[in-house]
Amino acid sequence: MTDNTRLRIAMQKSGRLSDDSRELLARCGIKINLHTQRLIAMAENMPIDILRVRDDDIPGLVMDGVVDLGIIGENVLEEELLNRRAQGEDPRYFTLRRLDFGGCRLSLATPVDDAWDGPLSLNGKRIATSYPHLLKRYLDQKGISFKSCLLNGSVEVAPRAGLADAICDLVSTGATLEANGLREVEVIYRSKACLIQRDGEMEESKQQLIDKLLTRIQGVIQARESKYIMMHAPTQRLDEVIALLPGAERPTILPLAGDQQRVAMHMVSSETLFWETMEKLKALGASSILVLPIEKMME
């Protein structure tokens, strides 16, 4: 990590964002061995070093200029931002873009048998959480006083253990809450993974590499959100068929040998193609409908 000409990226070593971060880098063409226990891995084909750390260390590494980029959940980033501001610091960084994974929500949850009449039900209560600053900001805005119980794991067991009256924790499906006799009552923050960059002057070669990486990330995300569609469509109903499949550009229309009533149509659709859409296409006279995934895409 002493070579300042190499781009330094921090990502979660293990946990909720680890696998998706690793897949994103791989699909961007960065060849790197992340299957070892090493905390620092060097890309084989680009001047990039990957620093594998705990997720709650990543915002600080970027804000302090130790690394150039970080892949982090917005919930962890915002919590660290509020923490540093509470200590009188002025943390600086840039959010380059939101990513298409790591979606979750930070929610309040109470025992299923407790009455719930809105956030005021928590006035004067003890709330267990790993996100004290996000919780405080939300309840301060509501004018609600509470006692915070800071836990760094297993937050959902706090009410049963008598440590708290309610919890504020990340929720994906709600299954963990249900298993612990809790119900989600209020969402206070919605989060996805994001790519952030340190503040300050960046070497030109590094900035060019960051720009290239951003272009590739955009292509990866567009490819995941798009499908390549091929079909035979009736010429008299082409406009109706196209209207069902919004895309970035107009479709490619090709003649069919020996068939004057239909054409072959190829297009990239920017929306998920549901079974209902395919059934509507078939009702319009389309046939031989193929929906294919896209590995890479660049407009």
Curated annotation (Swiss-Prot):
Pathway(s) per entry: Amino-acid biosynthesis; L-histidine biosynthesis; L-histidine from 5-phospho-alpha-D-ribose 1-diphosphate: step 1/9
Record has Acyltransferase as a keyword: no
Cellular component GO terms held in the UniProt record: cytoplasm
UniProt-listed Enzyme Commission number(s): 2.4.2.17
SUPFAM superfamilies, per database record: GlnB-like, Periplasmic binding protein-like II
GO molecular-function term, one example from the UniProt record: magnesium ion binding
Key words of the record: Amino-acid biosynthesis, ATP-binding, Cytoplasm, Glycosyltransferase, Histidine biosynthesis, Magnesium, Metal-binding, Nucleotide-binding, Transferase
Activity regulation, free text: Feedback inhibited by histidine.
Catalysed reaction equations from the record: 1-(5-phospho-beta-D-ribosyl)-ATP + diphosphate = 5-phospho-alpha-D-ribose 1-diphosphate + ATP
Enzyme class: transferase
Subunit structure: Equilibrium between an active dimeric form, an inactive hexameric form and higher aggregates. Interconversion between the various forms is largely reversible and is influenced by the natural substrates and inhibitors of the enzyme.
Protein name: ATP phosphoribosyltransferase
Species: Escherichia coli O157:H7
Name of the encoding gene: hisG
